[in-house]
Each structure stands twice: as C-alpha cells, then as structure tokens.
Amino acid sequence: MWLQQRLKVFPGLLSSSWARRVLAVSGFLVIIYWYIFSGSLFRSFWYAGPPRGISGACLHGQTMQWKALAEKGDVVMVSFPGEETKMQGPTMVGNGHIIVDVGKNNLWVSSLSVLFHLTNYSPLTFVKSVGALAETHATAIFFKEGLIRTIRCLQMEASDSSHDCVTVREDHFAHRSRPHVYVQKIHIANPSDRVVTFDISSQKPLTGETFTTSVEKVQERQFLLSSGRVSVEDGKIILVVVATKKLVSRLQVSPKSDYDETVFSVVYASEPIDPGKVSDTFSKLRESAKKEMFELMHMKTEDLFHEHQQIWSDLFVSGIEMKKIKDLHTPSRDTINITLYYMLSCSLAPLVDPILSNEERDKMESFLNYADHCFTGHSTMHAENLWPSSLSGITQLLQLWDLWKLTLQKRGCKSLVSAGAHGLMQGMLLSFGGLQFTENHLQFQSDPHVLHNSYSLRGVHYNKDLINLAVLLDKDEKPFLHVSVKFQDKLVKLYACEAGCLNEPVELTSEIRGHIFPVLVTQPLTPLLYISTDLTHLQDLRHTLHLKEILAHEEHMAKQYRGLPFLFWFSVASLITLFHLFLFKLIYNEYCGPGAKPLFRSKEDTSV
C-alpha cells in the first residue's frame, strides 16, 4: 500500500516542465559519465577483436607482433582497422636534411642556412593491385628502426582461406647516416595459384610549379632526374634535384612467389641563391645526385638498411618510460616516444657523418658524455607545449622542434643541441627528469610533489657509461629511487648518495638488481640524489649544504598538506552548534512554551 502511494506521486512530478528538464539533464549527464569512465567496455562493442573478412584475417596474422612491440613502447600504431590508434600527428620520416610526409606524399628539404621548406615534389611510389576483391591495411611507426611500415592484405579471388591473400609490405625511411637518401622498400608475397598484376605509378602535383624530369643512364642502369625550385624570403630560391630509380609501369608477380624492390631517391638542395645563378647551381646539384645514385646502385640493400637501423637503435638506447601516471598533465608513454621520434627525425646526426673530422667528433662526444650545467631549471615533465598529445602537421611539428631547441639552449644545453640528434635525445632526457650536470656531479632535482608518478630514465650518459634512474612506488605507494649502471668502457667507479648525503655514498655497480635509495626531502630544498666519480666530493657535500631538516617524502608531504585551517573547522563546528540550539528552541517552544499543546490527552478528552 505504501509503495502504491509513492508511485502515484511520479506522474504529478513529471507533469511539471521544470521536473522534466531536470530529469533530461540528469539522464544526459549519466550517459556522458558512462561513456567517459567505461570507455574500454563501451568501445569493445565497436572495436571487437581483429579486423573481419579474409583480408582482415590475413592482416591480423601479419601484424601479430605489432601489439607486443606496442606494449613495450617500440611501436606506435598509425592506423589499424577495428581499433583506436594513439597516433595524433603526421606520418613522417626524416633525417635533418629531408622530411618525407608519407601520409600526404610531400617532400620537405633544408640546407645549412635555411630550415625546412615544402617542395612540390611527390616522393612516394604507389603499388596498386589490379582486380582485388577486398583490401585491408595497417600502418605503424617503428622507433628503433626509424621507419614507417605499411602492410596491405589483398583478397584476389573468392576464398575461405586467408592463406591465399596477397601481402604488400612497404617500408619508408630517410637514411640516418646518408642525409640525402630516402628509401622505399617494397615486398610482395603471392601465395595464391594465380598471377597477380600491379600498376606502379607516382603522383603528379595538381598545382604549383612542377618538377622537370629526364631519364639518365649510368652503366646500363636508368634512373629519373627531376629538377625544381622553392621560393624563399628576399626573392631568393632554393634549387632541388631528386634522382629516383626508374621502375616499370606494370608488374606481374608469379604464383607462389615473392617480389622485392627497393626504390632509392637521392635529394640535393642548394642554399638560397639569386635567380641569376640557377644554371651553374643546377649543374652541380645534378652531378652530386648522379654520383650518389651510382653508389647506391652498387650497394647491397641489406647493408644500407643495417646502417640506418643500427643508428636508430643506438639513439633509442636512451629513453623515457612512464610506468604509472596519477595526474592528467603528465604525458603518456606513447606521447613521449612519438615526440622523441619527431624531434630526432628533424635533426641531423653529425656524429655518424663520415666527413666529420676526428677532432670535431671527439669534441661532440665530450659534450654528449658530460653536458656541464645541462639541464638547469625545473623539469619539463608537465610542460604540455613540449609534449603535445597531437600535432596538426609538419608545420606545427617544426615549430615544436624550434621550441625544444630554444628551451634546451636557454637551460644550459647548447653544447648538446650542437651535437645533433644524439645530443637532443640526451637534452630531452635530462629535462624530463630534472637532471643536471654540475662541475663535479650529476644531480636529480625533481620536484617532490610529482613523485607520485612512476617512471624511468634510461641511458643517461655519464662519461662513457650509461645510467638508468627510476622513480618507483612501493606497496604503500611511497616513492623510492632505483639506480643501475651499464659500463661501456674501462671500469670507472661511480658513487651516489641521497638528499643531504648524510649516509656514506654507495658505489654503483652493473648488477641487474641495481641500487635503491630512499626519497628524502630537505629544508631548504636540495637535489634528491647525487652521482659522481669523486667520492671525496660527495663526502664533503654534507658539510656544505647547511640544512635545517631532512624528512622522509611522506613526512614532507604531510607537512605540506596538513588539512584545512583551524578557522574553517571552528566555523563549521559553530554552525552545527547554532543549528542544534535553534532546533532545540523550536522543540521547546512547541511543547514547553506559552500556548504549548499537552503531550497526552486526558481521559475526559477522549470520552468527548
């Protein structure tokens, strides 16, 4: 009976326009909340499992390793059917001299005195199947190989088996130690019982000044030589010459066979010149492009790729790994890796340039091994403009590159920036963790308030050794520091001590288990960790810091956040007391004041 009476109230409530609005807004907010906080469950209805169809099953088999590599942070998905991708930026490869925007088929060039400019040349070679019934493709960036890989699976005939699908794999990379070389590797696998035909073509620009192309021949080998120009400031122009391997327009792949092709492109660009010097400059650029193309034609493709891959692998020996993120302003692992890849792709690598003199190389390596006074100031971990989650295109990417170089130069890392890609990686690594080299030691001066995030910095150069430093959390969510060393050259003793250096410095070893240091916070605030080759220097530090107190991290945080002030709690208590006094007064007046009603009726009253 009680429930029926309560249910009768609802129609009356809904008859009010105000109540209907409140109900509608509440329902809308519930839907939004459910979408945001149950994203993985909700999206599983739309992105359920691998891509469907014969070609989709084939693609799933071809890319099974991608998921494992993505979990390790070595790969980021650009596009994958049936799944959300984390790539929010241009699909590009570069080496500091050229940038190829694979997604938009654009070529950007730079010179010693001028930053990157967009050309009107289309560098990609397109391989289009003839007669495919269905096609599925996926693209990913491989950081340690410095390339973009696209896999396409083609269903050529009605079949129930994915094993009959034709696979086309394309690798794109701008060679790391050969700054003028762009490579597109094509591999076609045809396991079916029929001949498969492909059209080979390149896209011509629809607008702008086109490149003029001629066919050149060197020792029975043909290649295309394209020439064009780019207008820059002050009425000057940059001349661009591109030599590209000449391919057939139509290709047939026999049954049960594979086909491999490597398309080399050699790109030379001039310094800004006056229009009157075009003829002589073009002649020099063409000769340089022909010479390098001739060298490439006599090289093994495997050797060329190994050169490139080894350098990128060495670059990513250093890096940043986010293990646990507890706030919204800390960049994710993928955002960090993509940003590192972009910045390295825009930078030259003079340390691997064969024409660099031994004297210059030794000088750059000394900068890399001990970057004195880098990085000064606070950590860049939460600088969202330096670690953006998305980029609109190459133009914004180049602006980010300029911002990173400017930031590092102004924070004492000018020598690292001059060392090119290798130095830029070290500078970004030091800046993220708040690491700084001084005259005698390396210090970790991260803000104690951000240590609720767990992360690791690997491959920090100290002399010729590599230091790995991690901020980890124990079972009680309390932070501690883990340090390990990978010795590269002759054994040099390294020592470390935590904030204040009250305890005897510990000698660091190459043991896998590493060394653990507590997080101590001093007053006034000093670095959380010191690392040095000079034991006496660390022992003397304790006498020169002049500290008031040293607290454990949790004690420091407790003092920082002691709760709300006394005045607030006094006000709340006063309001509660006044409310109860007011309530007591109402009850008293009702039953005990003048004109109060009796609590119980007399028997005479009940008989009336």
Curated annotation (Swiss-Prot):
Chief location of this protein within or outside the cell: membrane
A Pfam family assignment: DUF2152
Top-level lineage group: Eukaryota
Signal peptide: 1-38
The keyword Repeat belongs to this UniProt entry's keyword annotation: no
Ion transport listed as a keyword: no
Residue intervals passing through the bilayer: 564-584
Residues carrying sugar: 337
Coiled coil: none
Cellular compartments per GO CC: membrane
Membrane topology: Single-pass type I membrane protein
Cytoplasmic compartment spans: 585-608
Subcellular location: Membrane
Record topological domains on the Extracellular side: 39-563
Keyword annotations: Glycoprotein, Membrane, Signal, Transmembrane, Transmembrane helix
Protein's name in the database: Uncharacterized protein KIAA2013 homolog
Source organism: Xenopus tropicalis (Western clawed frog)
